[in-house]
Amino acid sequence: MRTKAEIIKEFGKSEADTGSTEVQIALLTEKINHLTEHLRVHKKDFHSRLGLLKMVGQRKRLLAYLTKKDLEGYRALIAKLGIRK
């Protein structure tokens, strides 16, 4: 799992840019990937599964916002993160 600072440095406009949509989506994607691996091992951890579903919903809303705001940025971000087919 990459650190938060590394993700912010890669996707943010500056190192203090923690609130931009791209950074938020990248951070959520990292958390989602980590939690997905956890749930593969711990299949009955329903509490974490609920948290995962909430994170996926939040990322979906942020991606919809980014689509409306900056379509080219959206396409570049999903290609970089590999979250769409």
UniProtKB/Swiss-Prot annotation:
The record lists the organism as: Fusobacterium nucleatum subsp. nucleatum (strain ATCC 25586 / DSM 15643 / BCRC 10681 / CIP 101130 / JCM 8532 / KCTC 2640 / LMG 13131 / VPI 4355)
Question: Which Gene Ontology terms cover its molecular function?
Answer: rRNA binding; structural constituent of ribosome
One record GO biological process: translation
Which PROSITE patterns does the record associate with it? Answer: RIBOSOMAL_S15
Return the protein name.
Answer: Small ribosomal subunit protein uS15
Superkingdom assignment: Bacteria
Encoding gene per record: rpsO
Q: What is the lineage of its organism?
A: Bacteria, Fusobacteriati, Fusobacteriota, Fusobacteriia, Fusobacteriales
Question: What is annotated about its quaternary structure and interactions?
Answer: Part of the 30S ribosomal subunit. Forms a bridge to the 50S subunit in the 70S ribosome, contacting the 23S rRNA.
Single GO cellular component term: cytosolic small ribosomal subunit
Q: Cross-referenced NCBIfam families, in alphabetical order?
A: S15_bact (TIGR00952)
- Keyword field: Ribonucleoprotein, Ribosomal protein, RNA-binding, rRNA-binding
